[in-house]
Structure formats: structure tokens, C-alpha cells
């Protein structure tokens, strides 16, 4: 679902789309994952978000042909990736998320009505072995038990299925980057952690997935206008110096 979009610029100043200038002290309210995404849902798709833009730019070329395939978008939020996969020719698909507000926002999109359902990532309402392709974007940082997540993904995917995960890169997290948003002129931060590539790989390997590849893209020129439009152009060269997103491609070996 998800989209980390808060970038650290010091102990109190953060990039959050249209937040206060970096020189100003920003008061950030901390909210639970469920409450946070319910608040964010109304503006999630229209808020400029450099990490979502980077993730989409980096992940799209990695996805296989989905013509005639069955796809799942787990932690789908507003159905951002499910809509793309269905438009690319997937035979059938479904999106699951725990945020009812995010799902309502997704249902307003053309082509997604009837494809979205409320569910926990660790207890998906899908039968055994239904998916040729599964994507789970910007959600791992909200999940403590990656081994249970990988087992559940193994349950719902077919032999040889492809699984793609994306999340905030651990180096960004170490620099203070967090998941945040603006709501009614206030800044909010959602609790998140960052799993290393080794941790993610170990969890998925335990359920029979092989790591096909991992990439660690950095913010680059295509994302610069988002910073400039938000009045944060002076931050861009600093944040582009480290990997921003961790993208993993796994394949079921059974």
C-alpha cells in the first residue's frame, strides 16, 4: 500500500510534501498505522510523493508480462498497483488492505470496484495457490514478523509465482526518514521500521522463495521537481546520496 514520504532533514525539520520550510521547527503528531492511513486516504493519491514516484519508476520495468495471469496486490491501499496490473492485461486480480478508508478511496477508481477487500496481510482471504504474481509495496516496515508474512504469501501463490516487495530503504530509515503526511494543516508520522535485505531474504527463503534480484534505487532527476514544487529543492542533493527504496523480486521454487 504504502508510501513512506517523510524525509529527515535534521532533528526537527522534515520533508512532507507541503510542510513548513526546512529551517522551521515542525511539530509531528504520531499515530497508529491504522489511524494514520485512514486519515491519509483522502489525499494519498494526489499528494506529491517522491518515494512513490521513484518506486513506480524502478519497479515497473521489473514486472513480468501479466497477460492472462492472476495477480494479488497485498497491502494495496487505494489499489495503486492493482489498477496498473489489470490495465496491463491481468486475467483477474484482487487487492487486500486493512484500512477501510484507503479501500473506499480505491473503489472510486475506474475498474477497481469488486476487486478490493479488507484483510490483514497475515491472514489473506484467498484460496491456496491462486496468484501468478503478488506485489506488496511499502508495507514490510509495518510488519514485525516477516516469516509469517512469507508463509502466507507462499500459501496464496502458485508454483513458480513471482513476488515483488518494496519498502523504505534501511539507510533512509537510519537517516531519520519516516512515513508521514499532512492532514488539515498538521503533520503526522506513522510508526514504521526498516528490515535489511538479509532479514527479508532470510524470511522469504524459509518459505521456499528464491531471491531473483534486489535493487536499491536512489532519488534522481525525475523526482527533483517534487522537491522543488514543495519548496524543498535545497534538500534534493542531500537525500539523493543514499538508496531510498529497497525492491526485492522473489520466485516460488515449488
Q: What positions do the PLM features span?
A:
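Conserved class I S-adenosyl-L-methionine
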Residues: 2, 8-66, 80-84, 102-105, 162-191, ...
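Class I SAM-dependent methyltransferase SAM/SAH-binding core
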Residues: 72-74, 78-123
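A short acidic, Gly/Pro-enriched loop at the edge of an enzyme's catalytic core
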Residues: 122-134
